[in-house]
């Protein structure tokens, strides 16, 4: 994505989380706005220089974008954000900075207080978000990786245990203690991924050449494994990280990626097999344990999607067309997503109950989408749900321009969608 990149957004925007400059839902894809970047001695020569978009994540009403700027020495990673910040999920000064202006609807660099708390020399290299909470992985040479959390703590989302006071919750950020997961004497501890559902969090770690998996937050449906109260009833939520054990030994077959729905969690192993935890009430786990050769995974709140050499498969609820095939059902068995054209899936992203797919068809890159569309998040100009995949980029009005504007990445959130277009 070295060429100048345009970020387009559609969908739910009540708190300005699309960064379109206002707080109206966008029913068609609209450019996201970036604030002008302050120039410093380490900044690129021009604030208009297009950065590389590393990732986009979002909660219920806030968005984080991890950007890489290239200067004369090395790439510089920054976190930009927009939307709702009342719980501190966008940093302690975010709301004060935007008071009286409409800057909550524009992406701007977040002022995060690491150095004020003694964390000097750390670089953010990964971000994640659940409903009203944000997570930042901090890395420094020859030090253990640090996981910081900030924002709301419903269902223990912050991962800091039973907070003894409101003052602790109002701290600018928190350090998630993972030492009991890997052991206090472990060396070379790296956090390789942080994945969230609406209210549960899963972390992949490596320490001393071994893999560990930890999680916290909502747990009632087994999405963190079988956690029980002394009474034998399911633990509603865990406010502190717990070890997640999988049926497949991760030391022999490590986990490459994790995705989370509302009440389920899915793990892709190096062998191409899948482990799954949590609720199957909507059929969201159907067929996963016998799948082979899986290349990529993702989850909506109540569904699971796997990419195989044979194509994109889906399982779970199809009440709003989420599975990309016509039969409507609150619970459907695993089957293929039915593109009406010959399609090679290059990338795909699941939102709360909708899906975007970047495909190659007849030598052209296009974005197709389907599922729940109440906020216009599929960018069709309509609020009607979409039962089978339809092309959403490029739209007919810009077909000729699209010959020089190529979709390169897609992301999806809670009723929100993003497309990165390279010119």
What residues fall within each predicted segment?
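Eukaryote-biased RCC1-like beta-propeller repeat architecture
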Residues: 1-423
């Amino acid at each position: 994505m070295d060429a100048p990149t345009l970020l387009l957004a559609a969908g739910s925007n009540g708190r300005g989380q699309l960064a379109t400059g206002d707080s109206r839902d966008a029913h068609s894809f609209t450019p996201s706005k970036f604030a002008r970047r302050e120039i410093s001695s380490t900044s690129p020569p021009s604030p208009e220089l297009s950065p590389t978009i590393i990732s986009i994540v979002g909660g219920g009403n806030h968005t984080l974008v991890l950007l890489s700027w290239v200067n004369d020495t090395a790439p510089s990673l920054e976190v930009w954000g927009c939307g709702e910040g009342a719980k501190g999920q966008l940093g302690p000064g975010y709301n004060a900075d935007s008071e009286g202006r409409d800057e909550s609807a524009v992406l701007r660099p977040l002022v995060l207080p690491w150095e004020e708390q003694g964390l000097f020399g750390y670089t953010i290299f990964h971000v994640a978000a659940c409903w009203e909470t944000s997570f930042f992985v901090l890395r420094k040479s020859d030090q253990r990786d640090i996981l910081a959390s900030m924002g709301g703590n419903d269902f223990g989302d912050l991962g800091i245990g039973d907070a003894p006071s409101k003052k602790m919750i109002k701290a600018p950020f928190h350090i998630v203690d993972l030492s009991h997961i890997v052991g206090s004497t472990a060396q070379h501890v790296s956090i390789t991924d942080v994945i969230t559902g609406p209210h549960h969090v899963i972390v992949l770690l490596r320490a001393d050449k071994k893999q560990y998996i930890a999680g916290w937050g909502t747990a009632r449906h087994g999405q963190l494994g079988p956690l029980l109260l002394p009474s034998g009833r399911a633990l509603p939520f865990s406010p502190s990280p717990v070890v997640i054990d999988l049926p497949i030994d991760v030391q022999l077959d490590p986990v490459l990626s994790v995705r989370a729905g509302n009440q389920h969690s899915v793990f892709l192993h190096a062998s191409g097999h899948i482990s799954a935890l949590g609720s199957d009430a909507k059929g969201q786990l159907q067929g996963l344990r016998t799948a082979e050769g899986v290349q990529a995974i993702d989850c909506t709140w109540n569904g699971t999607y796997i990419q195989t050499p044979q194509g994109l498969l889906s399982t779970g609820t199809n009440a709003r067309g989420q599975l990309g095939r016509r039969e409507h059902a609150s619970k459907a068995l695993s089957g293929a997503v039915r593109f009406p054209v010959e399609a090679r899936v290059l990338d795909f992203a699941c939102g709360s109950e909708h899906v975007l797919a970047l495909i190659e068809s007849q030598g052209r890159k296009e974005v197709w989408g389907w599922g729940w569309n109440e906020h216009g998040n599929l960018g069709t100009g309509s609020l009607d749900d979409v039962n089978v995949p339809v092309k959403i980029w490029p739209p007919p009005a810009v077909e000729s321009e699209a010959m020089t504007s190529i979709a390169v990445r897609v992301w999806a959130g809670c009723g929100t969608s993003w497309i990165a277009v390279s010119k």
